[in-house]
Amino acid sequence: GVSDAAAYGVNGTAELADAIRTVKGQNIYLVAVVSTCVDTLMAERYAATAQQTASGSAYTDSSGGWVDPYNTFTRTYLVSLCKELRELGFDEVAFSYLQQPLAAAELKYAGQTGSPSRTDAVVALAKYLRTSLSATGLRVSAIVSADSILQEKAKLSGQDMTVLPKLFDRVCVFAT
């Protein structure tokens, strides 16, 4: 597992270190996919990290439990996790779920005055991650959904395709 995830009780059961050493020994480029805004265990175990609806309840949907992109704990955890993945031997991280839910529910954000847009929330997190990881030598990419970047859904997902390609080494479009 990854020690930071284990420390918070949100890690999986796989022990990666030996497998990574074996693969790296074969000179294979490794990419870790890191879910940014959907983390059911984090949202359940650390309620303060959960994305909230306008009524104050934790937001969940078929993707799982969502975490607040402005939450300091969430941001620090993501950066720490990525740095640890780099130390394990990963060459790149690709952020999945770097978006907001596609449902029309109104969302509240931690420590934010006013009502930032979903795009503001996603771009703020993307900039934070990019800046925080820039000195690591780790390539940083984003995975976006073809559905969520369509004009009518882009405002809901917050995935601004005029900004994300400027922040990341590559943007991968996941076609559904």
Describe each region flagged by the PLM.
Residues 65-98, 159-165:
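An active-site-proximal structural segment forming one wall of the substrate-binding cleft
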Residues 1-13, 109:
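Aromatic-lined carbohydrate-binding/catalytic grooves of carbohydrate-active enzymes
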Residues 16-21, 82-83, 123-130, 161, ...:
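Generic structural signal for well-ordered alpha-helices
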Residues 10-14, 68-76, 116-123:
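Soluble non-cytosolic domains of exported or imported proteins
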Residues 40, 46, 91-119:
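Active-site-proximal loop/short-helix segments
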Residues 142, 157-176:
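Aromatic- and acid-rich polysaccharide-binding/catalytic face
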Residues 37-83:
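Active-site-adjacent "subsite" loops/lids of carbohydrate-active enzymes
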Residues 29-39, 94-95, 116-158:
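Aromatic-lined carbohydrate-recognition surfaces of secreted/lumenal glycan-active proteins
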